[in-house]
Design a protein with these regions (language model features):
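Feature for intrinsically disordered/low-complexity regulatory segments and propeptides
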Residues: 1-95
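Intrinsic disorder/low-complexity polar-acidic segments
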Residues: 77-78, 84-314
Length: 314
C-alpha cells in the first residue's frame, strides 16, 4: 500500500494520531474540504503541495467524514448534519434488485463494475415491449430499420462524493448491443435529508422517465441535418468530448454514411459509437459511464445551431 501511494499521490492523512495513505480519488475531496483549487497546485513540489493543504485544513470549518477502503483514504467529505448523507451502497443495489424484479417482467442482470470511487450495475428490462413500441413505430415511419433493441437501466452510485445515486434509462441496439443513452438520469444527491426512502421513490419513476426519454430520442428523427460532418463535430466539441474520440467517431460516420444530408438521429447514433470504441480500448467502467452521460446531453441541444455549411477547421 505504501509503495503504491508513493507512486501515485505521495500523500498521507493524519487522523487522531493515525496515518492513512491517500488514494487518487480522495485528492479532490481533500482540496474541496480545504477550499482550495487551481492548476498551480499541480506544478509545485510535493512537500509544498502538502504544506499548502495543511495550512488550509487548519482553518476549515466543521467536521469531516472519512471514507476508508482497503487501508487508504478514498474521500474526505463534509461531516456536519447538513452536509454529506451516507447512502449505503449495498442497500442501494438490494433495493434496486427487489424493485426491478417485482415491477418489470423478465428483468435480467447484465453486468456492472466496482471501482474505488464508483459502482454501477446494468439490467435488461426484457418483457417490457411497450417501452419501445412507440419508438419502433417512429423508426418505421421514417424508413429506418427497427433492429433488435433492448430497454435497459443502469444504476450508478458512489460513496466518495463522485456522484449521487443515479438511474439511467438506456437502450442496447443491434447485434453488438451498442449502448444508446437516453437523456439525463434520475438523481438522488448525497445531500442532507437524502435517504433510501428517497431512492425507493426514484425507482418508481423509471417507467415514466423511460417514456419521456424515448420521445426525446424519437424527436431526433424529425430534425433534418444538411451538413452532418460539421454538425457532428460541433456537437461533440460543445459536449466537451476529446478531439481523439470525436475525430474517430466522425471518420467512422463518414465511412458508413458519407456526407449526405441525414437526421439528428443518425448523428446521435454515430456519436454513440464512441462508447463502443472506449469499451474496445479497455476503458474503465467509470469513464464509459461518464461518457454515456456526456453524450446524453446532446438530446437537449439545438441541433440546427451546429448545422452550418463550409469547410470549418475544428
Amino acid at each position: 500500500i505504501i509503495d503504491d501511494t508513493i507512486q501515485s499521490t505521495g500523500l498521507v492523512l493524519k487522523v487522531k494520531g493515525l496515518f492513512y495513505p491517500v488514494r487518487d480519488c480522495a485528492v479532490n475531496t481533500i482540496l474541496n474540504r480545504a477550499a482550495i483549487s487551481g492548476n498551480a497546485l499541480k506544478k509545485v513540489e510535493r512537500n509544498v503541495y502538502a504544506r499548502i493543504i495543511n495550512e488550509c485544513l487548519k482553518v476549515a470549518k466543521g467536521e469531516a467524514l472519512l471514507r476508508l477502503s482497503e487501508g487508504k483514504v478514498s474521500a474526505v467529505l463534509g461531516g456536519d448534519c447538513q452536509d454529506y448523507a451516507v447512502l449505503d451502497m449495498e442497500q442501494v443495489f438490494l433495493h434496486a434488485v427487489q424493485y426491478l424484479n417485482q415491477n418489470f417482467c423478465g428483468c435480467t442482470y447484465l453486468g456492472g463494475f466496482y471501482e474505488h470511487h464508483m459502482a454501477s450495475a446494468l439490467w435488461e428490462l426484457s418483457g417490457e415491449d411497450k417501452l419501445l413500441e412507440a419508438y419502433r413505430e417512429e423508426l418505421m415511419l421514417h424508413d429506418r430499420n427497427a433492429e433488435e433493441m433492448k430497454p435497459v437501466v443502469r444504476i450508478t452510485t458512489s460513496d466518495t462524493g463522485e456522484s449521487g445515486v443515479n438511474i439511467y434509462p438506456m437502450l442496447l441496439s443491434g447485434n453488438r448491443n451498442d449502448t444508446i443513452a437516453l437523456g439525463n438520469p434520475i438523481r438522488l444527491k448525497h445531500k442532507a435529508g437524502a435517504s433510501m426512502a428517497g431512492f425507493d421513490s426514484n425507482l418508481q419513476l423509471i417507467y415514466g422517465k423511460y417514456e419521456v426519454a424515448i420521445r426525446g430520442l424519437s424527436e431526433l428523427l424529425r430534425i433534418a441535418i444538411l451538413n452532418p460532418i460539421n454538425c457532428m463535430m460541433g456537437i461533440t466539441r460543445h459536449l466537451g468530448i476529446s478531439q481523439k474520440c470525436r475525430m474517430e467517431a466522425v471518420e467512422l460516420f463518414k465511412a458508413q454514411y458519407g456526407e449526405e444530408p441525414c437526421t439528428a438521429h443518425d448523428i446521435y447514433y454515430g456519436i454513440s459509437e464512441i462508447l463502443y470504441m472506449m469499451a474496445c480500448d479497455g476503458a474503465e467502467g467509470s469513464r464509459i459511464t461518464k461518457m454515456e452521460e456526456t453524450i446524453a446531453r446532446a438530446l437537449s441541444v439545438d441541433w440546427k445551431e451546429f448545422d452550418v455549411p463550409g469547410n470549418i477547421k475544428w
